[in-house]
């Protein structure tokens, strides 16, 4: 028996309204009162209706009902408000049509001054039309009216809030009071899921915006065994309930208050104790958020976060420790050692009555823990003042020189190293320094490796920290591994202090295992259990302080941490001197198109300064502007909304532009269908791939303004709506602009919706926004010609090009090159097509297939395909000459053609990819296009430059093992495009090969994720097998959803010839082949996977398509990836 499908209420409606939000089918059934009457006594006179039916759901929805009616009942949701009166009367008949009912309800509400209902928005009395009216009068609603009657329909439209499905996970409100959020509330982790039990009361801390929602228990389906040191785990305090995150300004204010509290107890403690360095290094890329004092680290889950944006840092100083660090502000004496002890361990009751002595010795001559700590901390403060610390930085992380500077400084560096060989501090050896080295590297690889950074940090710890405070030899190895784990974290990853304490056992610190906590005074005695507990607490606090105040701040102060253009999520650590040398060399290239302005002009335009950062890449650095602060301006939103509206309504203005793979699919598929319809198979195809050289920087600003002015209308009217979004922890409202197109049956978003993957509700209150052409030209002109940036004390203004990273940059670039294509390229291609036809006719050859071509461009990447070799060759040479009027020239090194050029007598196929199976491919925007059959695959060669683990991040603070099930499904989403599965483009073998390759990459990511998580948790094979099978089954639903929901217009329909059993078999086989290389780690999991694969029905007799998909030679690039 097939499982009954679940029709769940969207999360956003469930959070706001709870059980009062239901789908239309359930809401109607609950509205009808239960009357035990015979059909002959009912108003229907025995004909049968919803009121007298014994099975109301079966009467409302029948097996022969149309699909659009079924979708309406299940995907439309209704909210019954608390004070709504019940339905008193029911009549199965209707005297009016659905349109007449909706029109009369709207006119009645408007005449009664009740225009707050969403159903009245944008209603035109003269035309008697509105977008919402059209939605509520479709054939599905007419069909529903015949089933429920007049009274139920009027009640639904007047007394309830109705939400219709819009696009993806979005819904649009079409009746009821406008949905709004008065207060933004943050939810705890366990509140994300719902529980349908009405008897359970929600917790008091969970306060919803409009109504309370029942709480739910945690999902403990994943069997997890934590791997933590027993001694530490037994004495850790329980976590407090997670509180809502307050705003940034209030958090900063709270830090100051916390600092004042700590400062009262320890006058010498500086602001650095709260984890914030005030020497200007707060602009460094590695931000570590620690709130509150360090003494209560166990109660608060402090998080270390890798920020997304990075800024330029200051120059290096002689010291490797921040000048306002607490160790730099104290002196190596007894009184300052006590201040440091209180700062690290807080107030210990046993030590409060301890007598103070000038030298910090025990009065009885014994050695207690208190006085031993004073001596050790005194040595720690003294070692911090040493001048040898800078030498450790130069030794372990040398300043890497550029190629032209290496020869000049080689002799000098050798002599200086010989002189300093005898002065190296602890951790150095003469054998390591016997061979002089000249740190010369390739020109762009100036960063320090993670091993070098870890080596430097550990050398500092070994030098300044007394050996007794680092524990045994085994414990030292544990600490170094934890430091290495922290340094290797990727961008956007957060980690807690408890993860720094992984495998740290107080029993391995003999220093803290002394029998006496302090000298016994006045007969003061403690029980052995209390002494042991206090000793373990002191050891744990010491290790936490070591990581937070030494390790974290050494990385923060001495390195410039940033991401790279090709490094994905990895973080690269630059010595500040190396970074300054790289920037000083590349700054002249990065400032092409900028001119220096005087201070007076800069002072007047100081508010228009642009934030920027340098992003390392393979051949230099890229200057990326950060316009996140200016994105809030209304003028920028209006300009973006108008340009987006033009893109939707007038796509011809943008020429051959495509904006994503789905857009490429919509343009490509009709062309291929047309070619195959002429002869039944594809003719020989000739490709030309080109890339515009400095596409953004070479744009002529005057020409661009003229192009924009040529197609702008005098005035634009946009609809202003609200988008109520639902996140994992909170709900919020975004203001959006929607195209005012009366001919459209659904709203088209003209402003970019930043959270389009989340569940949201569109609320239209009928507000309009008017934008004039004159204002648009002023705003665009200011964005182009008044873009000012500051470098050191100099100010520069951009006079050429478009700033990269701006919200409008991509659209403006497409409009610019679209005008070039309509003016120069399209006429040239038409002439070339005529010349080719005339040559064929002059040769008296029968023209079987007329010349056909297609030109596509993704921002600055051109793809041209033609059935004529001469036309492709002429277009190739035209691109090589460039377009001087538009200052547009192609990058000579990125041309790619699949034919031999007659003039050059060679095939320019340096960018062609040929796999182990011998099939040639053309690379274009992350895709591999078969140059013979035009079949499309994903280009996985871009992953060859790094490790697979650099492509994802781990949410350490949100129980990553529980998230593994969802993560495995997310691994499948990025490469799942309809163009890969449509049989109009790809054959059955390539469709299954694309699915198999997606599974291969997901399996590699699965191994990397499990390897990361297994450091702290033990994952059972049965749990992993369960997660894998869920993701494999999810793949088939994902493919069907993507292919079914893509909007292709009326030109063609996608064709999917695929079975669920084939997808499951491909997924299981892909995981087996990938995990076989890690057999020792996944021995039991492989047994489960092989057993499931052997029981599969397709394993008995494989089709030729499945054999082709699993052939290793067809996926040669994937098997070369490093995982």
UniProtKB/Swiss-Prot annotation:
Q: Which GO terms describe its molecular function?
A: DNA binding; metal ion binding; telomerase activity
Q: Which gene encodes it?
A: TERT
Q: Please state every residue range assigned to the domain named Reverse transcriptase.
A: 596-929
Assigned keywords, A-Z: Chromosome, DNA-binding, Magnesium, Metal-binding, Nucleotidyltransferase, Nucleus, RNA-directed DNA polymerase, Telomere, Transferase
**Disulphide bonds in the chain:** none
Per the record, GO CC terms? chromosome, telomeric region; nucleus
Signal peptide positions are none
Predominant location: nucleus
Region annotated Disordered sits at 191-242, 410-439
User: Function, please?
Assistant: Telomerase is a ribonucleoprotein enzyme essential for the replication of chromosome termini in most eukaryotes. It elongates telomeres. It is a reverse transcriptase that adds simple sequence repeats to chromosome ends by copying a template sequence within the RNA component of the enzyme. Required to prevent genome instability induced by breakage-fusion-bridge (BFB) cycles. Can extend completely non-telomeric sequences using RNA template in vitro.
Task: From the Swiss-Prot or TrEMBL record, state where the protein is found.
Answer: Nucleus; Chromosome, Telomere
Give the matching Pfam families: Telomerase_RBD, TERT_C
Q: Which GO terms describe its biological process?
A: telomere maintenance; telomere maintenance via telomerase
What EC number(s) does its UniProt record assign?
Answer: 2.7.7.49
For this UniProt entry, which segments traverse the membrane?
A: none
The record's family statement is: Belongs to the reverse transcriptase family. Telomerase subfamily.
Q: Which InterPro entries match?
A: DNA/RNA_pol_sf, RT_dom, Telomerase_RBD, Telomerase_RT, TERT_C
Supply the name of the protein.
Telomerase reverse transcriptase
Q: Give the miscellaneous note.
A: In the absence of telomerase, telomeres decline by approximately 500 bp per generation, a rate 10 times slower than seen in telomerase-deficient mice. This may be due to alternative telomere lengthening, a process which is activated in early embryonic development.
Q: What happens when the gene is disrupted?
A: Low rates of telomere shortening at each generation. Null mutant plants can survive up to 10 generations before dying. Accelerated proliferation and cell death in dedifferentiated cells.
Q: Which domain of life is it from?
A: Eukaryota
- Subunit structure, briefly? Component of the telomerase ribonucleoprotein complex. Interacts with POT1A.
Q: Which organism is it from?
A: Arabidopsis thaliana
- Catalytic reaction annotation: DNA(n) + a 2'-deoxyribonucleoside 5'-triphosphate = DNA(n+1) + diphosphate
Chain residues that bind Mg(2+): 691, 860-861
The annotated regions of Polar residues compositional bias extend over 201-210
At the top of the EC hierarchy, this enzyme's class is transferase
């Amino acid at each position: 028996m097939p499982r009954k499908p679940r029709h769940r209420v969207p999360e956003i409606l469930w959070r706001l309204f709870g059980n009062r939000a239901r789908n239309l089918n359930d809401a109607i059934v609950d509205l009808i009162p239960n009357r035990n009457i015979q059909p002959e006594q009912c108003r229907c006179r025995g004909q049968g209706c919803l009121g007298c039916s014994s099975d109301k759901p079966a009467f409302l929805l029948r097996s022969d009902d149309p699909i659009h009616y079924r979708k309406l009942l299940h995907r439309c949701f209704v909210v019954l408000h608390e004070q709504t009166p019940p339905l008193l009367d029911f009549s199965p008949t209707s005297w009016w049509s659905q349109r007449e009912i909706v029109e009369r309800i709207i006119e009645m509400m408007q005449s009664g001054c009740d225009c707050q209902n969403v159903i009245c928005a944008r209603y035109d009395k003269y035309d008697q039309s509105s977008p919402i009216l059209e939605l509520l009068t479709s054939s599905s609603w007419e069909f529903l009216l015949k089933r429920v009657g007049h009274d139920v329909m009027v009640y639904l439209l007047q007394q309830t809030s109705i939400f219709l499905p819009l696009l993806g996970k979005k819904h649009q409100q079409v009746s009821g009071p406008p949905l709004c959020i008065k207060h933004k509330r943050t939810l705890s982790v366990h509140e994300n899921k719902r529980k349908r039990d009405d008897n359970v009361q929600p917790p008091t801390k969970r306060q919803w915006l409009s109504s309370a929602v029942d709480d739910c228990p945690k999902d403990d389906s994943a069997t997890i065994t934590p791997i933590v040191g027993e001694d530490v785990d037994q004495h850790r305090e329980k976590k407090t309930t997670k509180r809502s995150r307050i705003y940034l300004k209030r958090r900063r204010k709270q830090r100051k208050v916390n600092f004042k509290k700590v400062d009262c107890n320890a006058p010498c403690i500086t602001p650095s104790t709260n984890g914030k360095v005030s020497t200007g290094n707060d602009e460094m890329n590695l931000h570590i958020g620690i709130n509150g004092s360090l003494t209560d680290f166990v109660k608060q889950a402090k998080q270390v976060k890798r920020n997304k944006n990075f800024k330029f840092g200051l120059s290096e100083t002689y010291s490797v420790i921040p000048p306002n660090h607490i160790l730099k502000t104290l002196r190596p004496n007894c009184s300052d050692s006590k201040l440091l002890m209180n700062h690290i361990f807080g107030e210990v009751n046993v030590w409060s009555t301890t007598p103070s002595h000038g030298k910090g010795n025990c009065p009885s001559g014994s050695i207690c823990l208190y006085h031993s700590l004073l001596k050790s901390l005194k040595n720690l403060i003294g070692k911090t003042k040493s001048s040898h610390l800078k030498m450790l930085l130069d030794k372990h992380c040398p300043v890497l020189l550029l190629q032209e500077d290496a020869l000049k400084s080689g002799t000098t560096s050798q002599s200086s190293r010989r002189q300093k060989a005898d002065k190296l501090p602890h951790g150095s050896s003469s054998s390591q320094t016997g061979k002089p080295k000249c740190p010369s590297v390739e020109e762009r690889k100036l960063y320090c490796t993670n091993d070098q950074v870890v080596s430097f940090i550990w050398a500092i710890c070994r030098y300044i920290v007394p050996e007794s405070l680092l524990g045994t030899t085994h414990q030292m190895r544990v600490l170094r591994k934890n430091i290495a784990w922290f340094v290797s974290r990727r961008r956007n990853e957060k980690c807690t202090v408890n993860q720094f304490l992984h495998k740290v056992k107080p029993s391995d610190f003999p220093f803290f295992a002394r029998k006496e906590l302090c000298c016994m005074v006045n007969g003061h005695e403690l029980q052995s259990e209390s002494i042991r507990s206090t000793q373990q607490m002191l050891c744990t606090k010491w290790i936490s302080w070591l990581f937070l105040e030494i390790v974290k701040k050494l990385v923060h102060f001495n390195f410039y941490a940033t991401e790279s253009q090709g490094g994905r999520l990895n973080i690269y650590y630059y010595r500040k001197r190396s970074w300054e040398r790289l920037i000083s060399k590349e700054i002249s290239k990065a400032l092409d198109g900028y001119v220096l302005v005087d201070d007076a002009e800069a002072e007047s335009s100081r508010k228009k300064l642009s934030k920027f950062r340098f992003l390392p890449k393979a051949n230099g650095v890229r200057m990326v502007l950060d316009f996140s602060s200016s994105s809030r301006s209304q003028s920028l939103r209006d300009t973006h909304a108008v340009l987006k509206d033009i893109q939707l309504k007038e796509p011809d203005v943008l020429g051959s532009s495509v904006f994503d793979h789905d857009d490429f699919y919509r343009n490509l598929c009709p062309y291929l269908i047309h070619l195959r319809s002429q002869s039944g198979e594809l003719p020989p195809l000739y490709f030309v791939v080109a890339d515009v050289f400095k596409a953004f920087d070479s744009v002529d600003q005057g020409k661009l303004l003229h192009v924009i002015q040529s197609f702008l209308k005098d005035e634009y009217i946009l609809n202003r709506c609200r988008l109520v979004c639902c996140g994992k922890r909170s709900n919020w409202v975004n203001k959006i602009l929607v195209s005012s197109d009366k001919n459209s049956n659904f709203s088209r978003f003209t402003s970019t919706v930043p959270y389009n993957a989340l569940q949201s509700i569109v609320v239209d209150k009928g507000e309009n926004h008017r934008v004039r052409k004159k204002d648009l030209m002023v705003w665009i002109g200011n964005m182009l010609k008044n873009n000012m940036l500051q470098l050191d004390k100099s100010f520069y203004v951009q006079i050429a090009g478009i700033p990269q990273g701006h919200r409008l940059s991509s659209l403006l670039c497409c409009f610019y090159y679209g005008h070039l294509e309509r003016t120069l390229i399209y006429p040239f291609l038409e002439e070339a097509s005529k010349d080719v036809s005339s040559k064929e006719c002059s040769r008296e050859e029968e023209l079987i297939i007329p010349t056909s071509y297609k030109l596509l461009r993704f921002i600055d990447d051109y793809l041209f395909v033609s059935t004529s070799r001469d036309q492709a060759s002429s277009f190739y040479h035209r691109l090589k000459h460039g377009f001087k009027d538009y200052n547009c020239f192609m990058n000579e090194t990125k041309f790619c053609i699949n034919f031999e050029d007659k003039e050059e007598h060679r095939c320019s196929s340096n960018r062609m990819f040929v796999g182990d199976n011998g099939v040639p491919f053309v690379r274009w925007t992350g895709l591999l296009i078969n140059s013979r059959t035009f079949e499309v695959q994903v280009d996985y060669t871009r992953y060859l430059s790094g490790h697979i683990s650099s492509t994802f991040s781990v949410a350490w603070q949100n129980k990553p093992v529980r998230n593994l099930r969802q993560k495995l499904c997310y691994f499948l989403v990025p490469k799942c495009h309809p163009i890969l599965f449509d049989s109009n483009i790809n054959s059955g073998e390539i469709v299954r090969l694309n699915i198999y390759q997606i599974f291969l990459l997901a399996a590699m990511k699965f191994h990397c994720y499990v390897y990361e998580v297994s450091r702290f948790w033990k994952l059972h094979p049965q749990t992993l097998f369960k997660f894998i099978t869920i993701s494999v089954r999810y793949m088939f639903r994902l493919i069907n959803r993507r292919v079914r929901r893509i909007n292709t217009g009326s030109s063609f329909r996608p064709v999917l010839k695929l079975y669920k059993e084939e997808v499951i078999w491909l997924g299981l086989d892909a995981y087996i082949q990938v995990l076989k290389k890690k057999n020792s780690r996944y021995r039991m999991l492989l047994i489960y996977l092989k057993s499931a694969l052997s029981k599969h029905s397709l394993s008995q007799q494989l089709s030729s398509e499945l054999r082709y998909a699993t052939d290793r030679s067809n996926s040669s690039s994937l098997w070369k990836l490093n995982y």
